[in-house]
Amino acid sequence: MKPLKLKRLIMENNKSHATNLSLGGPFQGNCMPINQYFSKNQPNRGSSSSEKRSSLLPLWESKNAADGFSIVSHNVLLDGATTILNLNSFFECETGNYHTFCPISCVAWLYQKIEDSFFLVIGTKTCGYFLQNALGVMIFAEPRYAMAELEESDISAQLNDYKELKRLCLQIKQDRNPSVIVWIGTCTTEIIKMDLEGMAPRLETEIGIPIVVARANGLDYAFTQGEDTVLSAMALASLKKDVPFLVGNTGLTNNQLLLEKSTSSVNGTDGKELLKKSLVLFGSVPSTVTTQLTLELKKEGINVSGWLPSANYKDLPTFNKDTLVCGINPFLSRTATTLMRRSKCTLICAPFPIGPDGTRVWIEKICGAFGINPSLNPITGNTNLYDREQKIFNGLEDYLKLLRGKSVFFMGDNLLEISLARFLTRCGMIVYEIGIPYLDKRFQAAELALLEQTCKEMNVPMPRIVEKPDNYYQIRRIRELKPDLTITGMAHANPLEARGITTKWSVEFTFAQIHGFTNTREILELVTQPLRRNLMSNQSVNAIS
């Protein structure tokens, strides 16, 4: 039997296409009427009494006070709690079969974000085949990730896992010499009970390279939660203050940098306490997006002390009770929990900076946490953030004309559904349903509040939110509602297109730059692409006829 071996993922530079899967034949059965579908009085069949009680709590503050949770108390939290109470009639949990990628796919973007890292996925051939298809690279690229392939001798415990992993890590150190090695656990390591967390501290001492263990396996609800697992593990690694790689060249950690702010904006003891606060943003986005969001906050007098993850592992920020943290993506609830429980950080509850409306409120909530009022425009009397939001929407009129009055249906794939639905509602679309693999109503309280507010402002019904949707029943609802656009995973795209349903791959929103003010056009370009294709096709048919 062969021992555990290091298998580099090298493949041809080709593109993968969605498989034309069968959906069990043609559509059958009748769907519920639309008036019943949007009924506010429909019972919540998927929520238990304990889930209903917990949804009324203002995030983690009341429920887990003993765990050291703390949260910035703004009006949005009260509004968010009230909104969640009202959302019970719109929320449903089907616990059905749905399709998504494996969370180990987070390696695709994290190894590029953390430039001095090396990701080692510990799994079977199935994991390797998936990564080879999902992470296609050219043969001379030498990617900073590899596959530690488990074979029969490893699973039957005939080999010493520690010795084999040590041999591989020494080989990685010799070949690449990274600043950190990230072990990605898989379903197999869970089943055979590999003690990765127990081996990592001992091994990193021997080889002199920190090792972060992240169990990003198929037990999660969505593939984007793999990033959540890795960032949560890195947040725990930042607690090792005695480790040299956490200290920069100046000998100071990022959290020791004071927030630069004029004394005129704060007064008294509270002002001195605010001056000690530092801001750390967590979420993996491209470096151009981090620069844009950092500059947006700097315009309002707020300096970002650090990002999780950082481009270099040695710049990983440390966290303490004086650290304010705010999320970038809606699938990072585990990271937020770790930062609050283990690091005693304070979480700023805010919508996510997706779309100009979400970005504006996101910046406003951060400003409120630091006691800063957003700058005003002396001509209009509005805040500069509000004027900029309106200016961006005015510049998108060519896209908005195509979207107004159109309907969209989210089948659920990457946990970005609520933020995208809120933005598309603001653009004039009608959202029939928001399918989402997993919804943390506490972490997304502000996003849910903004969604409800946007629906009221646009005078459209609140969409039904279906957690863990059953794809079979979703397809029946799609047939009944006939949406103009269905945002779905790759597994269903081709079969739905074959049945005359316009689709868009949800995974494209994961890899596109959709955060901040400047990337709004990128979102609308993705959304309108299939609609414009249909429009051109219809025009061609009419011209021929």
Swiss-Prot record:
InterPro entries given in the database record: LIPOR_BchN/ChlN (IPR050293), Nase/OxRdtase_comp1 (IPR000510), Protochl_reductN (IPR005970)
Molecular function GO labels: 4 iron, 4 sulfur cluster binding; ATP binding; metal ion binding; oxidoreductase activity, acting on iron-sulfur proteins as donors; oxidoreductase activity, acting on the CH-CH group of donors, iron-sulfur protein as acceptor
Domain of life per record: Eukaryota
GO biological process terms on file: light-independent chlorophyll biosynthetic process; photosynthesis, dark reaction
UniProt keyword annotations, A-Z: 4Fe-4S, ATP-binding, Chlorophyll biosynthesis, Chloroplast, Iron, Iron-sulfur, Metal-binding, Nucleotide-binding, Oxidoreductase, Photosynthesis, Plastid
Pfam families linked to this entry: Oxidored_nitro (PF00148)
Record's subcellular location: Plastid, Chloroplast
Keyword match Phosphoprotein: no
Effect of Q529R: In strain: CC-503
Cofactor list: [4Fe-4S] cluster
Positions that bind [4Fe-4S] cluster: C102, C127, C187
Cofactor note: Binds 1 [4Fe-4S] cluster per heterodimer. The cluster is bound at the heterodimer interface by residues from both subunits.
The enzyme's E.C. designation: 1.3.7.7
Swiss-Prot/TrEMBL catalytic activity: chlorophyllide a + oxidized 2[4Fe-4S]-[ferredoxin] + 2 ADP + 2 phosphate = protochlorophyllide a + reduced 2[4Fe-4S]-[ferredoxin] + 2 ATP + 2 H2O
Main location: plastid
Pathways involved: Porphyrin-containing compound metabolism; chlorophyll biosynthesis (light-independent)
GO cellular component, one term: chloroplast
Biological function: Component of the dark-operative protochlorophyllide reductase (DPOR) that uses Mg-ATP and reduced ferredoxin to reduce ring D of protochlorophyllide (Pchlide) to form chlorophyllide a (Chlide). This reaction is light-independent. The NB-protein (ChlN-ChlB) is the catalytic component of the complex.
UniProt xrefs under NCBIfam families: DPOR_bchN (TIGR01279), PRK02842.1 (NF002768)
Family under the similarity heading: Belongs to the BchN/ChlN family.
Subunit structure: Protochlorophyllide reductase is composed of three subunits; ChlL, ChlN and ChlB. Forms a heterotetramer of two ChlB and two ChlN subunits.
Protein name per the record: Light-independent protochlorophyllide reductase subunit N
The organism of origin for this protein: Chlamydomonas reinhardtii
Gene label: chlN
